[in-house]
Structure formats: structure tokens, C-alpha cells
Amino acid sequence: MIEHTIQLLAKKKPKFRMQCLLKAAIAEVIIAEDDKKPKVIDSWVGWTKKNFSKGEANFVNAVLRRCSETIEKTKRSEELSVIYSIPNWLIERWKKFFGSSKTDGILEILNKPSEVFFRMSPDSAAARVFENYTQFFSPSKFENFYRLNSGNWKNASPLLETGYFYIQDPSTYFAPNQLKPRAGGKYLDLCASPGGKSRIIADLIKNDFLQNREKYGAETLEESLLVSVDFGNRIQRLKENMEKVDFMDCKVVDCNLLKEDLKQKLEAAGLPTAFDGVFIDAPCSNTGVLRRRPDARYRIRESDISNCAEIQRKLLEKYAGYVKSGGTLVFSTCSIDEEENAQNAEYFSKNNPDWTITVSKTILPDEENDGCGFFAAVRK
């Protein structure tokens, strides 16, 4: 909306440094209370006169004094793509998938500031550690997810060194949970970096062991295996996060899943090539996390949707064979576009009749859930 306002009020496109100045100044004018707006404008005009020129200061003064009125007119005109800084083609796709009313709600929430959530591992040791940090958090409606109170990052950050806590949106929990991982099982997480969903899978395995200790042997948890795969410069962060899991066997494998032979790499590392469950957190358009990644809305193109959908289909077809008979394949994205999500799940099911879709769900954003996306589980 700010860029649109500058376009309306400037007779010609300002130079880059003037664009940067105007964006910052207009943003401050917008959020200022009405009785403080004149002071904010005068401050920016004075700064421009001192650091640019008198003529440019006059230009800034003219733009800032008219920007609030221009923005209000834009809002009344219901130009959604301008108001919410979301490409019009994407808004039209959402209207097609979800209807106008639900799309309006999505747009509203995606433009609100993101929250920071800490996820706590589900065991008593984690709870005891957290007792010393509760004052820095607020509870959420999601079990084991706690919202960090503003201004408390420095106070809360030591939790991340313990191995019991991880920063992630509550929505990230839903897809890994569909694997229903069990202690003693073997699981494969593809496109795993930075490791948030691998950490969830590991905690789910641990929770199963703790909840059903009487039916497992003492060594069952340690015998569980989770192999997390990614490649290139994404590997180091994945390793750092998975090294904090000390209660079961976690391996990290460097493999370009579209270009290299994963089976060969697994065998070379002495790892199995058949798993009780495979999780694919596929590359996607990121349309479900525009609240968390606001820059993505300026980069995304409509062609990206189809390109991502094609990559996702290739991953599904290529790695379904790593699931044991009776096992589960979970496909997940952080997109809310049907072409990348339900259509891909249906495509896979149609072309692989020995697989059955057990769940297929799109998660839309809400006030307490920054992230959203899609997951589907298919059983062999």
C-alpha cells in the first residue's frame, strides 16, 4: 500500500534513496496517533532538508501531508491487492478456492505482526526447566506451545540450548503427527532442514515411549531411528538442531533428492532403505506463511505455483517406495494453494492405487497460528 501511495502522489518515480526515505516516513505517519502526525511529518521534513536538499524536503512535506488521506481513499475503494500488499492474481486464486469472505479473513490475518512460539518437549524434565521461565511467556491454545511475550527474547533464549525447546509455529505440529510414529520404529524425514519437523517427530516417538512404557523394552527408545535428509548449505543447521536430540538414534544425510541417489547414500552409511513412515515437507510457494515471511509476497509469481507442484509430484513418486508395506507417507507444504496440495495428493492416489488417502487437510491462518499450509497422509 505504501508503494502504491507513493506512485499516486509522485509525478514521476523518485530515486531509490528517496523511495526508501518515503517508505519509512509514510509508515511512521500511518502508525502515529492523529494528534502526533504533524510532529512526525515536521521531523521527517527537517531531516530531509538537513541531509538531502530544500527542494526534496518540500517534496517530502507534500507527500506526507497527503498520504493519510490517499490511503483512506484506497481502503474505501476496496482494492484488496493494494490494501494488503498481496498480488491480485493470488487473491483471485484464493477466492476461487475459499470464497470471498474467507479470503478477506486470510488477508487480514496475514498482515498482522507475527508471534514467536516456543515448543516444549513433552516430558517432565522439560517442564521443570520451563518453571524458571514462565514469566516470559503466555499460554496458547496449542498444547506445549508458548507465546513469547514482547521484549523477552534475551531472557528466554537460554531455553534453546537445552534441547527441550524449539521455535516454531503451532501449525508445524499437525503434519508430523500424522505419521503416528512409535518407539522402536524407523522414520525418514525428507527436505528436513532446519530440523523443526524432525524434532517434532523425535518428540512424538519419545512421548509414545513415555506413555506406553509398560509395553516397551528398556532399550526401545534408543533403538528408534530417524533419518533427516537435506543438502548443501542447509545441512549444517540441520545437524546442529538434531545433535540436541540425545534420547534416540538420529542421522543426518546430505543428498539432493531430485538429482542424487538416496538409496546409495543410505546404504553407504549403513542405514535402512525401508521405513515405517516417510515425511516429505516439500518445497513450495510459501503462500501459507506470508505473515512470517512478508518478503515472499513481493517475489512470488503465478508460474511458481505450477513449478512447485511439479517438483512435489516428483518427490512423491520417487520416495513413496521407501515406505514399508503398512507404513505411512505424509506429504506437507506451507502453501494453501490447491494445485500444490489436495490436487497433488489426489494425483498421487490416482496413479498409485495401492495407496489410500487417510487424511487431507488445509490449515488456514488464525489469530493464534502464524503459519498455515497443508498435509495429507497416505497409507500403503
Pin down the residues of each PLM region.
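S-adenosylmethionine
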Residues: 1-380
